A protein has these predicted regions:
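Amphipathic alpha-helical protein-protein interaction segments
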Residues: 4, 8-12, 44, 82, ...
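Hydrophobic residues positioned within well-ordered beta-strands of beta-sheet architectures
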Residues: 5-7, 53-55, 89-91, 104, ...
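Generic structural detector for well-ordered beta-strands
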Residues: 8-10, 94, 122
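Hydrophobic, Leu/Ile/Phe/Ala-enriched alpha-helical segments that form helix-helix packing faces
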Residues: 22-26, 93, 219, 223
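Glycine-rich portal/gate segments that line the openings of hydrophobic small-molecule binding cavities
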Residues: 40-106, 110
Length: 246
């Protein structure tokens, strides 16, 4: 079962400022785990006035202990014993300054065999006020949605279909006597594919519910820096945030 997260809120800043802050949001005091950001493609359509940007983020993270315990070592790849790892995130965004909206979609390029995460943002200038006074230039509406889908359950079902119903959750995920302790195998063996998938998605949803408010706070920090010191203060803040170890 796929898990979803959604949130709506408003920034007390104009759309132009918010859309600029989006591209300057890493790193910030709430996102020092972002090791690097590279722009790999950018194009402007003169007919529509839309700017399309593709970026690649490298993020450091720590896999939840419950997930580390759940997965056989063959699935942990380069993750450390404490679950520390890093992954690339591909982000595509489109900005339409004339119409006053921006949309972005980010997805993980690593760990897809464990969990696929698709995060979508929409930033929008409020519609003209009913009284006909024009736009509220000091606010921007935001909608964020995150879709979490574990791939492990799909692989278990497919491999069981090929190998027969006698295959255990551990065996179809690549675990074995050399890959996981017997105690761990016994625990996984008692789980059905749906339970494994649901557990990973549920743990990830709980983590998303905690991280998204922090991401919102991080954007507010960047917005405040833009308001008080412009681009210079933002760049100085980014430099300081990079120097702080997570």
């Amino acid at each position: 079962m796929v898990k979803f997260y959604s949130s709506d809120y408003t920034y007390d800043y104009g759309f132009n400022t918010v859309s600029l802050a989006y591209f300057l949001r890493y790193p910030n005091p709430y996102a020092r785990h972002v090791a690097s950001t590279d722009t790999i493609e950018r194009s402007f359509d003169p007919e529509t006035g839309r700017l399309t940007t593709v970026r690649l983020h490298l993020k450091r993270s720590r896999m939840p202990p419950a997930v580390v315990k759940l997965l056989p070592s063959s699935y942990l790849g380069n993750a450390g014993a404490d679950g520390r790892t890093q992954s690339f995130i591909l982000e595509r965004s489109v900005v339409d300054v004339k119409e006053g909206w921006m949309e972005s979609e980010s997805r993980n390029l690593d760990w897809n065999n464990v969990l696929s995460v698709i995060e979508k943002h929409r930033y929008e200038r409020p519609k003209a006020l009913a009284e006909g006074t024009g736009y509220n230039e000091d606010s921007t509406k935001v909608n964020i949605s995150v879709t979490l889908k574990s791939r492990i359950g799909e692989q278990i079902r497919k491999r069981r279909a090929m190998w027969g119903e006698q295959a255990t959750a551990t065996s179809v995920m690549g675990g074995g006597e050399e890959d996981a302790p017997l105690k761990k195998q016994g625990w996984l063996s008692s789980w059905g594919s749906g339970a494994v998938r649901t557990a990973i998605e549920t743990i990830s949803l709980q983590r998303t519910e905690k991280s998204q408010p922090k991401a919102q706070k991080g954007m507010k920090v960047v917005l405040e820096r833009l308001r008080h010191g412009g681009l210079v203060e933002v760049l100085e803040g980014m430099r300081a945030d990079r120097e702080v170890e997570i």
